[in-house]
Every structure is written in structure tokens, then in C-alpha cells.
Design a protein with these regions (language model features):
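Conserved helicase motor core of P-loop NTPases
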Residues: 304-481, 487-490
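C-terminal accessory regions
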Residues: 380, 496-608
């Protein structure tokens, strides 16, 4: 039995289903518990699976869970849950909530690595406390301001106005909505409203932030644009610039620590974070520790998008079902402020329900938009509806089903058409404009249909067309790059994209990056952290970015990384035109597959 379990775990490692690191953790804890034996054999299995679960995006491993079991491990290998629980708690290295132990097993039989359990507990506690707090406001003054900021456009509740009213009443506000639903437009008006309603002698200290430099730049741009349409006399003392969360918190190079923490909190009254679906558990825990208890927090995001690359689906857990579940008391307050409000929930609402709102009306994609229709169809999970949209003949949507050699020939044409302007740009500014107009997105990194294969193909195509000069295959003018590792001293972060271009002042080739304020900043190539070519990037890396035109390439075979959320995120990166290259069966499999990440956060946030 002992040899069987270990040999099966070894085989799972060899097949790439679990990491060698996962098995080593299991073996280490088995040794700490006293070595081999039936009980410790069950510990070896549990610890290895808990660690492997984290590498697959889960926060914990439910003991009853066998659907996501590596194929090399037969379900019969899993002990009966109640017996397994007893043996784990008797091992000496597994504790319960409140204990300090390498592994934590909660009452629902969810097994956590200690640090992730601590993060989940902290996040749940901090958010529940903020959601429970009540803000006082003058309803007469507030209603007049809300009417100025959100003039009536029709019958029924204006959810953007309702979100602003919620911001007055609740120190924590979670706004979810698809692309073009006006999240940042609403946020700009919320900032104006809160600043106008503030009774202090000094204006509110407000910060804008996002997980990546690109997302921060987009937030900056959106808030500036929204300010232009504010009513006269409003919009004073608005923040000038968004920044990355790492910069806001003061990341310390070479560590996972931040300058701002519970002992040295941020000096803020209000923090607005965009693209919150990209925030992982560790970063959110650090943020909540550094945010003063009295400060307001507004999170903007799209619950249907991909979750963070790291463990958890934090923003989706915050949003719950997405449907309004407001209390009678809150609805009465909203009615007083706006004159209208949806009906209160018939079911008892959880602690976070009164702090969440879903914006539904899209303004970017009109009724005749194929991109918007396809995103909605994918989100519904209906393969039939997806196919109906794809073959309706929308002008902003193109579908290509070619495979094999035909696919490569077609891709060569698309690469030349899409990147000609960037590769042939006369100036750095023109090159950046062209780079931000078109992007090729892949679902995977490896293989001929992954970013590695497509970037190699793109460089070959452009070189043969005479658009890349010189023999150097890495350092050449016009090469787009993406940063893969944070470099805090250079203010470069994982996912930042740049362009290699000669500096007009010294004619030296440098890597240029767009800062959140719009400036182009040069970096000497020898100082760059880990990076790669970025004609094509993964959908994960493109999250938080938008492009006028996107070519979305799915692999020719089914892959476990394909999911409805991945597809939806890729589709909604396109603003004006989407070209989808996908095998029919692979596309259908992606639409049917829903990402499920195990954690206890949603239960802790939404259970009464």
C-alpha cells in the first residue's frame, strides 16, 4: 500500500500531472510526522494533492473531491473522508482553523496550505467588517447630486446611479460588469460624488490602482475621459494618475513583502481598483492589511473573466451569484436617494450582498455588434447560440476553421497584414500606436498554436518580407516584447509590453514601455528582467488590455486550459474587430467547460 501510493504519485509526476515540488512537500511532511505507515501514507497523499491543487489554481483540496484527481491516481486510492480526516488530524502536522501547522483542515474537510488558509481568513474577515460598516449621508444633498451626475434617460432603475448611491452608504463597493458597461465612467462620478459630499476641511485622499501597468494606464485614460463629461463645477480634487498595486503598496525588491502593511498603513481615504479579477489571494491580503480600517474600497471588474494566474477566483467569489440580493433596509435607503430601486431579495442575504452590484447595459458593443453578441453567447454556455452568432455575418466578426498546413498558410497572411504597420513604422510613436491596434492571442504557450510557435512564425514571416533587418534574432528594431518577471527598481511588471527601438539621441537600441501617464520610457536591454517576444501573447497575459483588432487562436486539439472564461476574456480584448481561428469541436469544448476553483471564500463571504 505504502509503495503503491508513492509509486502512483511518482508516475503522476512523470506524466506532468503534479509537480515534483508537490511530491517533495508530501514526503517532507510524511517524514516530519514520523515516517512511513498507513496513517502517514494518507498524509503523503493529502499533502501532495493539497500542494498540487494550488498549482492548478485551487486554494484548497476538498477531501471528498475526486473529479480533479490526476489520471495516474485511481479514485479508490482516496480514503473514506471521515477516516482520512481523523488520521490527518492525528498526524501532528495538520491543524484546524486557529492552529499554526503546515496544513489546515477546516470543518468542511477542505485541506489548505497554512499560508493560503491565513490569507483566506484575513480576506473574509476584513471584507465582512468593511461590508458591515454603515456610512452616514445627507439624503437631500445626495439626491440632488445624484440627479446632476446621472440625468434620467428612461424608465426603471439606473444601475450606474444606484452604484453611486451604494458608494455613499457602504465603505466597501464591488462593481461587476462586462466590457463597455460603464464601470470606470461610474467610478469617476462616484469619486466626484464622494468628494462633493465630504465634510472635512481637506479633500479626500484618493488613489487609483490596477494589478498591471497596462491596466493602470487604461484606468487612467478612462477616468480622464470620464472627467471631461462631468457637470460644470464638479470634478475637483480628482486623482491625477493611476498606479500598479505593487507600486502603491511599495513592493520590496527580492522579497514578497511591501513597505505598506498593518504597521505602516497607506495614507488614504478612498482606493479604487480596476481589473480586480486579476488580483490573487496573497496580493489582496497584503492590500487589505495596508488599507486603513476607515478607508473606502471600490473594486471594479468582470466576474465572467479569467481569474488570476495564481490560486483562487477572488473577484468571482466576492460577487457571488451576480444577481442582486439586497436587504430591505438597503433598498429603502436606495429608494430615498434615487427614487427607485430593485425589489429586495426574498432570500436572506449574506454579509457582502449589500456591497455588490452588477452593471448590465453595455455601451461599447451595440446591438449589431458581433463581438458583443459572441461574448454573451459564450457566457451563456450555449454552443448552439455561439454557432448562430458566428454564422450570422456580423461585419466585426470573422471565423476561420482551417487546420494543419492550410492554417499555417492562412496565419502567414494574417501576420503580415496585422504587423506590417508596426514593423514598418517610421517612428517610435507610430510603432506603439500600431502595436496597440493589433494583437494575436493564444490560449496556450507551448506548441505550434501557442505563443512560442506563433512568435517564431511571425518573426520568420516579417523577416522574409524585409520588415526585420539585420541578422540578430533577438535584438532588432520593432521587436515587441513582454515582461515575464517583476523588476521593482525599473518599475517593470509581469505582463508589461514594450517595443525595441533605437533612441534618437544616441542611436542605441532600447526597450520602450508606456507608463501609466502615457509617457514612453526607455530601458537599456541589458537591464531587462526575463522577457519574450510578443507578436502573440497568451489570453492570460492580455487580461487588462484592449486592442482595436484581435486574432484569437485556439489549439487544434482540446486542452484542459480551454474554458468558457478563457474564451470570453480573449473575445472581449477586441474593441472593433475579432478574427477567431478555431476548430469547431475545440471551440464547443471550450464553451462547455466552466472553470471551477476550490476555496472557502465565497461561503465565508456570503453565508449568513
Amino acid at each position: 500500500m505504502i509503495r503503491s501510493t508513492r509509486s502512483l504519485l511518482e508516475r503522476a509526476c512523470e506524466q506532468g500531472e503534479i509537480r515534483r515540488l508537490d511530491l517533495h512537500l508530501g514526503l517532507f511532511l510524511e517524514k516530519q510526522a514520523g515516517g512511513a505507515g498507513r496513517t502517514n501514507n494518507e498524509l503523503l497523499l493529502a499533502a501532495t494533492l493539497a500542494s498540487a491543487a494550488v498549482s492548478n489554481g485551487h486554494v484548497c483540496w476538498p477531501l471528498e473531491q475526486n473529479a480533479a484527481l490526476p489520471a495516474a491516481l485511481p479514485p479508490a486510492l482516496l480514503p473514506e473522508p471521515s477516516r482520512w480526516r481523523r488520521s490527518l488530524l492525528a498526524s501532528g502536522v495538520v491543524g484546524q482553523p486557529g492552529d499554526t501547522a503546515p496544513l489546515i483542515l477546516d470543518q468542511q474537510n477542505r485541506l489548505y496550505l497554512y499560508r493560503l488558509h491565513a490569507c483566506e481568513e484575513l480576506i473574509a474577515r476584513e471584507l465582512r467588517n468593511r461590508a458591515a460598516a454603515i456610512s452616514e449621508t445627507d439624503p437631500q444633498v445626495a439626491r440632488l447630486l445624484l440627479e446632476r451626475l446621472f440625468p434620467r434617460k428612461g424608465n426603471g432603475p439606473d444601475l450606474q446611479q444606484t452604484a453611486a448611491a451604494l458608494a455613499l452608504l457602504k465603505p466597501l463597493l464591488v462593481i461587476s460588469g462586462g466590457p463597455g458597461t460603464g464601470k470606470t465612467y461610474t467610478a469617476a462620478r462616484i469619486l466626484t460624488l464622494l468628494q462633493a459630499m465630504h465634510s472635512g476641511s481637506k479633500p479626500l485622499r484618493i488613489a487609483l490602482a490596477a494589478p498591471t501597468g497596462k491596466a493602470a494606464a487604461r484606468l487612467d485614460e478612462s477616468i480622464r475621459a470620464a472627467r471631461q463629461s462631468l457637470p460644470d463645477g464638479l470634478g475637483h480634487n480628482m486623482p491625477e494618475q493611476a498606479q500598479t498595486l505593487h507600486r502603491l503598496l511599495g513592493a520590496r525588491p527580492g522579497t514578497d513583502e511591501f513597505r505598506h502593511n498593518r504597521d505602516n498603513p497607506l495614507v488614504l481615504d478612498l482606493l479604487v481598483i480596476d481589473e480586480a479579477s486579476m488580483i490573487d489571494m496573497m496580493l489582496m491580503a497584503a492590500l487589505l492589511e495596508a488599507l486603513p480600517a476607515r478607508a473606502r474600497l471600490i473594486l471594479l471588474g468582470d466576474r465572467s473573466q479569467l481569474a488570476s494566474v495564481e490560486a483562487g477566483s477572488l473577484f468571482a467569489d466576492l460577487c457571488g451569484s451576480g444577481e442582486p440580493a439586497w436587504s430591505e433596509q438597503l433598498c429603502a435607503q436606495l429608494r430615498q436617494l434615487t427614487g427607485d430601486c430593485p425589489q429586495p431579495s426574498a432570500e436572506p442575504s449574506g454579509p457582502l450582498a449589500d456591497s455588490c452590484i452588477l452593471l448590465r447595459t453595455g455601451h461599447r458593443f451595440h446591438g449589431d455588434s458581433g463581438i458583443g453578441s459572441l461574448a454573451a453567447a459564450v457566457n451563456s454556455g450555449s454552443v448552439e447560440e455561439v454557432e448562430r452568432v458566428l454564422f450570422t455575418g456580423f461585419s466585426d466578426l470573422e471565423i476561420e476553421h482551417c487546420t494543419g498546413r492550410t492554417r499555417e498558410d492562412w496565419l502567414r497572411e494574417q501576420i503580415l497584414r496585422g504587423f506590417r504597420d508596426m514593423a514598418g513604422a517610421a517612428t517610435l510613436k507610430e510603432g506603439f500606436v500600431a502595436m496597440e491596434k493589433f494583437r494575436l492571442l493564444c490560449a496556450v504557450h507551448k506548441g505550434p498554436n501557442g505563443t512560442e510557435g506563433i512568435n517564431s512564425l511571425a518573426a520568420t514571416v516579417l523577416r522574409r518580407a524585409g520588415l526585420i533587418s539585420g541578422r540578430d534574432t533577438e535584438w532588432y528594431q520593432g521587436r515587441p516584447i513582454i515582461i515575464l518577471r517583476n523588476h521593482y527598481d525599473l518599475q517593470l511588471f509581469n505582463g508589461d509590453t514594450g517595443l525595441l527601438w533605437r533612441d534618437e539621441r544616441d542611436r542605441q537600441l532600447k526597450a520602450w514601455f508606456r507608463r501609466p501617464d502615457g509617457r514612453l520610457h526607455p530601458v537599456v536591454p541589458s537591464l531587462l528582467p526575463e522577457r519574450e517576444t510578443a507578436y502573440a501573447v497568451t489570453i492570460h497575459k492580455a487580461q487588462g488590455s484592449e486592442f482595436e483588432q484581435v486574432l484569437l487562436l485556439l489549439p487544434e486539439e482540446e486542452s484542459r486550459v480551454l474554458s468558457r472564461e478563457l474564451l470570453y476574456t480573449g473575445i472581449t480584448r477586441a474593441k472593433s474587430r475579432l478574427i477567431l481561428c478555431a476548430d469547431r469541436e475545440t471551440l464547443a469544448a471550450a464553451v462547455r467547460s466552466r472553470t471551477q476553483r476550490h476555496s472557502g471564500l465565497a461561503e465565508k463571504l456570503h453565508s449568513s
